[in-house]
UniProtKB/Swiss-Prot annotation:
Gene that produces this protein: gatB
Gene3D superfamilies: 1.10.10.410, GatB domain, N-terminal subdomain
Protein name: Aspartyl/glutamyl-tRNA(Asn/Gln) amidotransferase subunit B
Source organism per UniProt: Pseudomonas savastanoi pv. phaseolicola (strain 1448A / Race 6) (Pseudomonas syringae pv. phaseolicola (strain 1448A / Race 6))
Gene Ontology molecular function, alphabetical: asparaginyl-tRNA synthase (glutamine-hydrolyzing) activity; ATP binding; glutaminyl-tRNA synthase (glutamine-hydrolyzing) activity
Keywords: ATP-binding, Ligase, Nucleotide-binding, Protein biosynthesis
Subunit record text: Heterotrimer of A, B and C subunits.
Amino acid sequence: MQWEVVIGLEIHTQLSTQSKIFSGSATTFGSEPNTQASLVDLGMPGVLPVLNKEAVRMAVKFGLAVDAEIGQHNVFARKNYFYPDLPKGYQISQMELPIVGKGHLDITLEDGTVKRIGITRAHLEEDAGKSLHEDFQGMTGIDLNRAGTPLLEIVSEPDMRSAKEAVAYVKAIHAIVRYLGICDGNMAEGSLRCDCNVSIRPKGQVEFGTRCEIKNVNSFRFIEKAINSEIQRQIDLIEDGGKVIQQTRLYDPNTNETRAMRSKEEANDYRYFPDPDLLPVIIEDSFLEETRATLPELPPQKRERFQSQFGLSTYDASVLASSREQADYFEQVVSISGDAKLAANWVMVELGSLLNKQGLEIEQSPVSAEQLGGMLKRITDNTISGKIAKMVFEAMANGEGSADEVIDKRGLKQVTDSGAIESMLDEMLAANAEQVEQYRAADEAKRGKMFGFFVGQAMKASKGKANPQQVNELLKAKLEG
């Protein structure tokens, strides 16, 4: 039987506010346990929550960015459940009236096609604390630093049909929240976590199958692996005569398997009701327009502009626009070098390779945009060749200064004097007289292969400094003259 996969995602983004959503406690990551928890966060009696206006602004920003309905009358609710790291015995969230309603996001797939993914809603809520199972033998420690940290939970429609589509969607959300400056997107620190709802159904069937939710997956690679593992588990289970049970599961990267955590709850299990300590939030039109005016150019618009303004391919434009820092770096390189396609190639390939090897983000690049732009300018004005440029780039990455400083210090300036190149070619051809005779006696097909040998010898003789175009032209004339 052929199966169709149905995937919906819940993405929890930690908002980059200075303080928590209902208290003045700091949200700094990595502080000593329980040093950033106020009486409000601890759920002490007699204290009241006060809503963080900046968290509201950030949620509205996201809603506007995904063309969503904004809940101008939204309400906080209590989500009731017991867990040791939830000190109040309930989580303040939103249920019936969220701050962000229906919207959508277009994702670009590997084959270049664009698919629209519906966004059901996005709501504000507070994060829970953290249980520390490994720090105490036979006991569990509770760190409440994270309790009350503002989250925006983004819930998608079940519109994805493969793990790769799900990853593309998460990457698109990741890019948008970073562009907006509302979340740092640091998945290793838990700033962006994903719950994956996965079900299967016979191809052509309209009704959904029974879904399972994989909780708290925190990397793009693990999202893909966890979903594929769960898909295969459900297929094997049904084809062996079993039945999928609705449940919450955890992904174990060591075994590449999902395992049952608990039965999956429905909304009514949490007994939601409006929080009596918090008034409904009224968002005025003026607040909406003020927030809309602060929206930056977002990845889809930037991608389109890169294609139209710089003549880049869809793929190149998508890669360069995938992060705000990379897009800004690229544009600065272009403004200095004047050659967008050359800049795109160097930023994506050479610089990308360097950053991957060193485990750095582009904002930590050892080669600044000014340095790279200056070097590319020396390629376009024929001061250096592309081959020499790689040596210059490596030197800049090692802290040897600007391109001009490296070129002058190492004597790498390209030889463009025709007389000097001709003299060098004459010496090289004389040293390879036998190969010259073979070349002249060969047919056109063999000559093409042999010509590369002479070019290599010429560049070796000039230590890579001779202008490759001049070498090709003069060499051809001498060999066929």
